[in-house]
């Protein structure tokens, strides 16, 4: 039997990664927190299932522990385009490939440890001036946090829909039973699409195709990459294909009155960055501090700051998607000068400054392209 409280300090709409991270961070600040989601756990979501070192550090600040048998460590990135390939290790530790459901279970465990109230199978019907409405009545609260994803109803109810920019791509994911052949997250670049490959277990890989074509599926995309197709064609599937929209969205505001947004509900970057989870973890920590300090403007400022590096890296990486000419020259240049790619990877995970990135990556890369 689900017991719904009549009152709580903060009510979080959405029990995915952002909602649970928010609950954990807010409980650490002493707030009473209730989370509601219409789904039953563990909640799955289509993504590349790779956590970079900085995302793992954010999880650590939330006190979340991943079980060793549930993740596979990877050392960096590898880009592949035709015959050209380049890889680089993270300068600040290893990443972790992990099934989204295992991550969700770890977040649930931590949220329960902190004393958050979790309501599963409970949809939120709307907002009131003093709380939220459920099927069973109204829950009074001081703050409502919308953590209900890309198509956030809370964002719509609060009048926060106005976006400064928006673009869409489409992703389709499948898991394969196969021993990882790589210790990197691999991105295969093709004409109009990319395929991301993440080792997530000793006998399992996560494979995602991303494109602007909502009809392009893995079965059509994989033959475009003969080497990868050859590795996977005889591997058994461990999941059915699952799709999702990857949006690049910047909102004009992330709070209004007593309603705040976090995670994809508050804006998002393209999945090519692999930064969505880190962003929601860091946003949750910033949100908790701002509410503890009773300073919503500080949350808005922190939110903008957190989004800058991922937005820049997404724009940089997606420029390769727009132009085959540029993509081939960049990949050839990176292959011949791996130190340039190493600086890009360092920037990607927050281990290099903008000045370092321009001096050690962008300027040398530009010279290579012009000389090609």
Predicted regions and their residues:
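Beta1/beta-strand and adjacent pyrophosphate-binding region of the FAD-binding site
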Residues: 2-18
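Glycine-rich FAD pyrophosphate-binding loop
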Residues: 11-13, 24-47
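Conserved Rossmann-like nucleotide-cofactor binding loop
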Residues: 18, 41, 151
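Conserved N-terminal glycine-rich FAD pyrophosphate-binding loop of Rossmann-like flavoproteins
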Residues: 39-62, 74
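A conserved beta-strand/loop capping segment in the N-terminal third of enzymes
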Residues: 56-106
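Predominantly flavin-linked oxidoreductase catalytic cores and closely associated redox partners
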Residues: 110-234
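FAD/FMN-dependent oxidoreductases across multiple families
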Residues: 213-289, 297
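C-terminal helical "tail/cap" subdomain of flavin- and related membrane-associated enzymes
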Residues: 289-372
């Amino acid at each position: 039997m689900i017991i719904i409280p009549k009152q709580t300090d903060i009510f979080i709409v959405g029990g995915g990664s952002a909602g649970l991270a928010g609950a954990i961070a807010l409980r650490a600040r002493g707030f009473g927190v209730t989370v509601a989601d219409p789904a039953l756990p563990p909640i799955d979501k289509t993504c590349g299932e790779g956590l970079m070192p900085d995302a793992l550090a954010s999880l650590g600040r939330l006190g979340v522990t991943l079980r060793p048998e549930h993740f596979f460590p990877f050392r960096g990135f590898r880009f592949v385009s035709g015959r050209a390939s380049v890889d680089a290790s993270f300068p600040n530790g290893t990443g972790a490939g992990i099934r989204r459901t295992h991550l969700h279970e770890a977040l649930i465990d931590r949220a329960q440890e902190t004393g958050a109230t979790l309501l599963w199978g409970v949809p939120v019907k709307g907002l009131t001036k003093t709380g939220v409405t459920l099927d069973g009545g109204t829950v009074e609260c001081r703050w409502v946090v919308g953590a209900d994803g890309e198509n956030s109803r809370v964002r719509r109810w609060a009048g926060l829909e106005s976006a400064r920019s928006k673009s869409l791509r489409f992703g389709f994911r499948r898991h394969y039973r196969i021993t990882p052949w790589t210790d990197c997250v691999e991105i295969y670049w093709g004409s109009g699409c990319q395929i991301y490959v993440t080792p997530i277990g000793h006998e399992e890989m996560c494979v995602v195709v991303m494109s602007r074509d909502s009809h392009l599926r893995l079965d059509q995309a994989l033959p475009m990459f003969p080497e990868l197709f050859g590795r996977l064609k005889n591997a058994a599937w461990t999941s059915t294909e699952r799709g999702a929209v990857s949006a690049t969205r910047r909102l004009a505001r992330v709070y209004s009155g007593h309603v705040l947004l976090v995670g994809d509900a508050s804006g998002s970057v393209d999945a090519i960055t692999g930064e969505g989870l880190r962003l929601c973890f860091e946003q949750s920590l910033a949100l908790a501090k701002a509410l503890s300090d009773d300073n919503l403007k500080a949350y808005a400022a922190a939110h903008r700051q957190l989004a800058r590096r991922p937005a820049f890296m997404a724009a940089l990486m997606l420029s390769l998607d727009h132009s085959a000419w540029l993509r081939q020259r960049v990949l050839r240049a990176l292959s011949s000068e791996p130190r340039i790619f190493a600086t890009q990877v360092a920037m990607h995970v927050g281990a290099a400054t903008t000045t370092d990135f321009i001096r050690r990556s962008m300027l040398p890369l530009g010279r290579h392209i012009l000389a090609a």
